[in-house]
């Protein structure tokens, strides 16, 4: 089973809110996920609000989960990918 770290959209029209989840690559965007890793709120006034459980993200990366481009950018901004590369 190929696992991806990706965003699941929540919120109302023109007011998105996302969960960062580990999901089967074949599942639909807002479909079944395996585990929630964090949240991403791009609508915050000053800057996008990101909350990530670092241990869960590192666990999934170690197990071979591939992040999507957007999640890759979020993880690198938070410094999680640097920690993952240092552990290799």
Swiss-Prot record:
Organism superkingdom: Bacteria
UniProt-listed InterPro entries: Ribosomal_bS16, Ribosomal_bS16_dom_sf
Pfam families named among the record's database cross-references: Ribosomal_S16 (PF00886)
A GO CC term attached to the entry: cytoplasm
Keywords: Ribonucleoprotein, Ribosomal protein
Gene this protein is translated from: rpsP
Protein name: Small ribosomal subunit protein bS16
Keyword Metal-binding: no
Source organism (scientific name): Staphylococcus saprophyticus subsp. saprophyticus (strain ATCC 15305 / DSM 20229 / NCIMB 8711 / NCTC 7292 / S-41)
Upper taxonomic lineage: Bacteria, Bacillati, Bacillota, Bacilli, Bacillales
GO molecular function terms noted in the UniProt entry: structural constituent of ribosome
Coiled coil: none
GO biological process: one example: translation
Record carries keyword Ribosomal protein: yes
Family: Belongs to the bacterial ribosomal protein bS16 family.
């Amino acid at each position: 089973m190929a696992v991806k770290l990706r965003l699941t959209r929540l919120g109302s029209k023109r007011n998105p809110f996302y969960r960062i989840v580990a999901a089967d690559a074949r599942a639909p965007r807002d479909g079944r996920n395996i585990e929630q890793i964090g949240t991403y709120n791009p609508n915050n006034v000053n800057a996008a609000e990101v909350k990530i459980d670092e241990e869960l993200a590192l666990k999934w990366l170690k197990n071979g989960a591939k992040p999507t481009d957007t999640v890759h950018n979020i993880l690198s901004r938070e410094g999680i990918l640097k920690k993952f590369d240092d552990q290799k």
